[in-house]
Amino acid sequence: MYPRVMHAVCFLALSLVSYVAVCAETKVATNCLVKSENTHLTCKCSPNNTSSNTGNGSKCHAMCKCRITEPITMLGAYSAWGAGSFVATLIVLLVVFFVIYAREEEKNNTGTEVDQCLAYRSLTRKKLEQHAAKKQNIYERIPYRPSRQKDNSPLIEPTGTDDEEDEDDNV
């Protein structure tokens, strides 16, 4: 997988874990007599359908639940729970995600070492091929000349004697 996809998945998993940590509300069958920072008493009014002949004919029976919310410990202490905490956590993580990759994009715009190395190699290869082609053309234009070795044999073999040359001088 690509590293960006893996990091995005990790950020989403972390946001889900933080959502679970913030929203970890356990319903306890107590009457919330011991008041602490983590206990919340929520009550709802449900009409009681008893056949009583009273004045208004409807009674409200309060149904209360005591909830204990566990404070968040991962991303810092803020007192938000429910869907708001998930959205806030997701926004914070996405901002961090995009800040990290904006910095990484700035580094990549200067060029990575691998790309520079490949570009240098291809340029060097092209220059070497051009140089070899020029040398080939030069060697094709110059006729073949065997190298002269230093041996003590004379270049011109004597065919006659020196007497013939002396005769020409007398004339």
Swiss-Prot record:
Residues 133-171 are annotated as: Disordered. The keyword Glycoprotein applies. It is found in: Virion membrane. Coiled coil: none annotated. Residues 160-171 have a biased composition (Acidic residues). The chain crosses the membrane at residues 80-100. This is Protein IRL10. It comes from Human cytomegalovirus (strain AD169).
